[in-house]
């Protein structure tokens, strides 16, 4: 997708806004909230420019510790999967864990960290 409208239209998506602070090893380093994350560099990505990353709920995970701190505001077991809503700064992010029996289940109010692979997001 080349816009937030299209990305949201073709399925559920999270949008995180950040500024490119570096380009290294084929990745862009974006300042998101209070930390920096690596993403696959978009074509013509430029240091100093603002970007939005599109993160699908199934492309993210939660870990006990990490750079991108978040707070769980919804944790809902759905049988075959676990739905989460977390706050990253002031941004609500929705996640789906399709293999919850092999992962820790986070409860509402817990602090943890959002994680994703650099190539697991799309940069707008």
Regions found by a protein language model. Name each.
Residues 13-124:
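Non-catalytic connector elements of ABC transporters
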Residues 1-10:
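Conserved beta-strand-loop-alpha-helix hinge in the C-terminal portion
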């Amino acid at each position: 997708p080349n816009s937030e409208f299209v990305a949201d239209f073709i399925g559920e998506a999270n949008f995180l806004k950040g500024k490119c602070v570096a380009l290294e090893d084929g990745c862009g380093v974006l300042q998101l909230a209070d930390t920096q994350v690596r993403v696959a560099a978009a074509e013509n990505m430029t240091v100093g420019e603002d970007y939005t990353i599109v993160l699908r709920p199934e492309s993210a995970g939660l870990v006990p510790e990490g750079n991108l701190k978040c707070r769980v505001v919804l944790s809902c077991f759905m049988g075959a999967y676990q739905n989460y809503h977390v706050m990253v700064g002031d941004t609500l992010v929705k996640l789906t864990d399709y293999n919850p029996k092999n992962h820790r289940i986070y409860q509402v109010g817990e602090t943890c960290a959002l994680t994703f692979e650099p190539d697991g997001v799309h940069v707008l």
